[in-house]
């Protein structure tokens, strides 16, 4: 064994061995337990960041541990390669997105390999390659024919300068991020998945996922947003509206119906359109509403504005005339684009009514009383007994719900209804770098799916977009085609799919990535699925994880998979955070400096109290810890860390610094500490191996000191097995290894028996570290005399007999205060323990002259003498 620990050489040798032996290539082995461990695949942005390193290290530790339990483990990797960043980079660098993407993939793949991940690279998928998205198009055509995908007009953010649709996050203060033009809302035809058809199942089957964090399940439940309420119809006032009809609203609070004082409609509602005729001010307000963001989150925070119309509707139960307002907070795509407003019991309506001096009528007795003041109180929204509601007075929420429903049914003006917040998933994107939608528009036949023998519809890769709409719409060579049904001249769809579609089924494709007869080989898919452990950030809690669950059910209903859910267990890893430093610039902005360029001063408790820039020695402001990001310039390049310390040190630090689901604070001293620890392990093993390997340990001949050492080894094995296997607490498992290392370093090495015990200890340390620091473990295992590589070794088994103690130390308290300790045989009786405690020299001093009232013995732990 080399005297020095040289990570670069050790890691290169281990990785070469794994490549040569194809150590991570996996095939189906019927009868052997399978384990599918998957980390969310990366977007090929150019370089790995520390968040990636953490995510993939966590997955790799779990995968390697499960392999050591004897399971057939699948851990694949791929690239979520379509998307806007490639288009933006292409425009900036005047290069085709395909070229930029493939170059990034090549570089990032070498980075991932340098981490020593146990990945089966033969299963790699790249979502922008036709051999992948062809099956997405195939499924699209199947679902279109079944009606699960349909086309309808949708409201989008339209940039009139660039002539393109913008995502909500590309609209900044009402203007296009690139052009600066004022954004308009437009209706354009788009394709939608009927995810609402699966809303009930998506909600109910969350209960089948005990291995998911409650927080994520709650977020999905809220997003799906199932609510039982009432559909209420307000008859048109014919004198003001001019014709018969009813205004439909949906409310979850029908008990407050008698408190409705006005109704509000969305800018797109037919009544708004009618009211604006001959009313330029109202028309201008409607146009303003339509130009706002279409994001629900923005709606929630924006100022509530409205304008009255001359129209009236009738209260369905009292016949009272209620004014119709147009309001910017009413969404056309939720409910029926209209709300009944009860200002006394809804905060939004309350704000609006106070702003525009509309009546407020309390109809529920709340904990705040019967009256409603001029300032909103949370209590006003409570359920309670009805007041000021005529025949319904005195009823509680449930009673009022039923009674008001019965009254509305009698008048044929309402009924109870279940509604979902979840909307159908619009997947059309007016972008170039995405999967082409496989539809042909024929003047005679309408929308015709591309036949299977003409798939894939291939995206031309040699295109440099200019940002002004989709280049596909300006490429006749792409869109000119003939109708598959009638043969007439037709036009190919030029929209591409939302990139969330690719990431909604990739986990299934890994089971048979080269299968060319279908989206998946059902036999292989059902062998591996569902994924046993999925790892990724909490930011994907809703969209990606919901869409993947939805797609899995679509694949099940197509007969491609048999399971109901894609991911059995979910681990949402925390962020990687680091200190930030800045100076305020002359324009009032902030110039951020990388921590590597800053010299810091700490107090006695290691808190940062001052910082200076290394280049000029002048102070910089301390901004606190934040998520590593380019904008705050507080990122650490993983590549430089791997080159300086080795992948094992980086992996060890990442796993030791924090539990996986908590934020991890980057610390250079922590990385140094991890490196120091691995050098200690190497030094101890090297000294041991260089003396020659010992013979077998004679368990029957162990002396007391050796028994204590062996107990420490097996205590570490037992605790680490629980920490890693049950709780993914890698940090406490590593702490166990550090504890046993302290014991082994002090252990005697004078006899053959001592050295055989040290051999057992070093083997345990190597095996416990193997999933976390696989390269050094590969080398140590070989040096400790094993022909079989550590990658094929089993997780260490605890010897329960080693944990049995001949003697135990008990603390002795007098009236609850520690006064001494006694060492007793493990099998000592209660009487023997009590006698020893009473006769302890120090205890005698504290009970002298007192009467002993009671002696409490907690076996194996303590004795408490109660005396006065």
Swiss-Prot record:
The keyword Repeat does not apply. It comes from the Bacteria. One of its GO terms (cellular component) is cytosol. GO terms for biological process: leucyl-tRNA aminoacylation. A motif ('KMSKS' region) lies at residues 627-631. ATP binds at residue 630. GO terms for molecular function: aminoacyl-tRNA deacylase activity; ATP binding; leucine-tRNA ligase activity. Keywords: Aminoacyl-tRNA synthetase, ATP-binding, Cytoplasm, Ligase, Nucleotide-binding, Protein biosynthesis. Its main location: cytoplasm. It is found in: Cytoplasm. Pfam families: Anticodon_1 (PF08264), tRNA-synt_1 (PF00133), tRNA-synt_1_2 (PF13603), tRNA-synt_1g (PF09334). A motif ('HIGH' region) lies at residues 42-52. Gene3D superfamilies: 2.20.28.290, 3.10.20.590, HUPs (3.40.50.620), Isoleucyl-tRNA Synthetase, Domain 1 (1.10.730.10). Its EC number is 6.1.1.4. SUPFAM superfamilies: Anticodon-binding domain of a subclass of class I aminoacyl-tRNA synthetases, Nucleotidylyl transferase, ValRS/IleRS/LeuRS editing domain. It catalyses: tRNA(Leu) + L-leucine + ATP = L-leucyl-tRNA(Leu) + AMP + diphosphate. Transmembrane segments: none annotated. The keyword Cytoplasm applies. NCBIfam families: leuS_bact (TIGR00396). Belongs to the class-I aminoacyl-tRNA synthetase family. This is Leucine--tRNA ligase. The gene is leuS.
């Amino acid at each position: 064994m080399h005297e020095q620990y040289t990570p670069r050489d050790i890691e290169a040798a281990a990785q070469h061995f794994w490549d040569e032996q194809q150590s991570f290539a996996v095939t189906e082995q019927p009868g052997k337990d399978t384990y599918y461990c998957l980390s969310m695949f990366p977007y090929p942005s150019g370089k790995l960041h520390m968040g990636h390193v953490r995510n993939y290290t966590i997955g790799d530790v779990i995968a390697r541990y499960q392999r050591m339990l004897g399971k057939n483990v699948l851990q694949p990797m791929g690239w979520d390669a379509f998307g806007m960043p490639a288009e933006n980079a292409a425009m900036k660098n005047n290069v085709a997105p395909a070229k930029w993407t493939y170059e990034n993939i090549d570089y990032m793949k070498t980075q991932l390999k340098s981490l020593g991940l146990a990945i089966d690279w033969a299963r790699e998928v790249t979502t922008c390659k036709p051999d992948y998205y062809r099956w997405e198009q195939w499924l699209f055509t199947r679902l279109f024919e079944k009606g699960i995908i349909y086309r309808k007009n949708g409201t989008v953010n339209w940039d009139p300068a660039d002539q393109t649709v913008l995502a909500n996050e590309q609209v900044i203060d009402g203007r296009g991020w690139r052009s600066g033009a004022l954004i308009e809302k437009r209706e354009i035809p788009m394709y939608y998945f009927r995810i609402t058809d699966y809303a009930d199942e998506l909600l109910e089957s969350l209960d089948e996922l005990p291995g998911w964090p409650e927080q994520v399940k709650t977020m999905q439940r809220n997003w799906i947003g199932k609510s039982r309420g009432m559909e209420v119809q307000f008859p048109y006032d014919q004198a003001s509206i001019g014709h018969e009809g009813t205004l439909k609203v949906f409310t979850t609070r029908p008990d407050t119906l008698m408190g409705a004082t006005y109704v509000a409609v969305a800018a797109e509602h037919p009544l708004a359109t009618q009211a604006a005729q001959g009313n330029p001010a109202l028309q201008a307000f409607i146009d303003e509403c339509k130009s706002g963001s279409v994001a629900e989150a923005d709606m929630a925070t924006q100022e509530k504005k409205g304008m009255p119309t001359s129209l009236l509707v009738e209260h369905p139960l009292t016949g009272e005339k209620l004014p119709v307002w147009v309001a910017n907070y009413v969404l056309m795509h939720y409910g029926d684009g209209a709300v009944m407003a009860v200002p006394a019991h809804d905060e939004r309506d309350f704000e609006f009514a106070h702003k525009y001096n509309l009546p407020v009528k309390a109809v529920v007795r709340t904990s705040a009383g019967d009256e409603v003041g001029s300032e909103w109180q949370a209590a006003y929204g409570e359920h309670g007994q009805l007041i000021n509601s005529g025949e319904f007075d005195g009823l509680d929420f449930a009673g009022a719900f039923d009674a008001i429903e019965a009254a509305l049914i009698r008048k044929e003006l309402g009924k109870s209804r279940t509604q979902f917040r979840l909307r159908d998933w619009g997947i059309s994107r007016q972008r170039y770098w995405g999967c082409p939608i496989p539809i042909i528009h024929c003047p005679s036949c309408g929308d015709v799916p591309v036949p299977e023998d003409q798939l894939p519809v291939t995206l031309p890769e040699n295109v440099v977009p200019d940002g002004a709409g989709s280049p596909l719409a300006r490429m006749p060579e792409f869109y000119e085609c003939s109708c598959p049904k009638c043969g007439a001249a037709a036009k190919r769809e030029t929209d591409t799919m939302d990139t969330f579609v690719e990431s909604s089924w990739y986990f299934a494709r890994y089971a048979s990535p080269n299968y060319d007869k279908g989206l998946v080989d059902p036999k292989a898919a059902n062998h591996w699925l569902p994924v046993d452990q999925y790892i990724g950030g909490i930011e994907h809690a809703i969209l990606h994880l919901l869409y993947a669950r939805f797609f899995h059910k679509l694949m099940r209903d197509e007969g491609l998979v048999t399971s109901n859910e894609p991911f059995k267990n979910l681990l949402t890893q925390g962020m990687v955070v680091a200190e930030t430093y800045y100076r305020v610039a002359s324009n009032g902005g902030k110039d951020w400096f990388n921590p590597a360029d800053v010299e810091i001063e700490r107090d006695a408790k290691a808190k940062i109290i001052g910082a200076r820039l290394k280049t000029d020695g002048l102070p910089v402001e301390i901004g606190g810890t934040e998520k590593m990001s380019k904008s705050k310039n507080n990122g650490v390049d993983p590549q430089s860390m791997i080159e300086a310390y080795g992948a094992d040190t980086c992996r060890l630090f990442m796993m030791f610094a924090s539990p996986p689901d908590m934020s991890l604070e980057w610390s250079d001293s922590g990385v140094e500490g991890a490196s120091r620890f691995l050098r200690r392990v190497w030094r101890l093993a090297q000294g041991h191996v260089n003396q020659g390997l010992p013979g077998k340990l004679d368990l029957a001949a162990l002396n007391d000191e050796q028994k204590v050492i062996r107990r420490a080894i097996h205590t570490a094995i037992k605790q680490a097995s629980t920490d890693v296997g049950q709780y993914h607490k890698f940090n406490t498992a590593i702490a166990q290894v550090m504890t046993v290392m302290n014991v082994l370093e002090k252990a005697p090495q004078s006899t053959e028996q001592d050295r055989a015990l040290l051999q057992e200890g070093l083997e345990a340390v190597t095996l416990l570290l193997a999933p976390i620091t696989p390269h050094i473990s590969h080398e140590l295992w070989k040096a400790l005399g094993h022909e079989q590589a550590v990658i094929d070794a089993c997780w260490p088994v605890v010897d329960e007999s080693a944990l049995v103690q001949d003697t135990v130390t008990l603390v002795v308290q007098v009236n609850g205060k520690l006064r001494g300790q006694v060492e007793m045989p493990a099998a000592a009786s209660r009487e023997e323990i009590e006698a020893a405690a009473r006769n302890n020299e120090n205890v005698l001093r504290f009970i002298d002259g007192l009467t002993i009232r009671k002696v409490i013995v907690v076996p194996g732990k303590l004795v408490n003498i109660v005396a006065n």
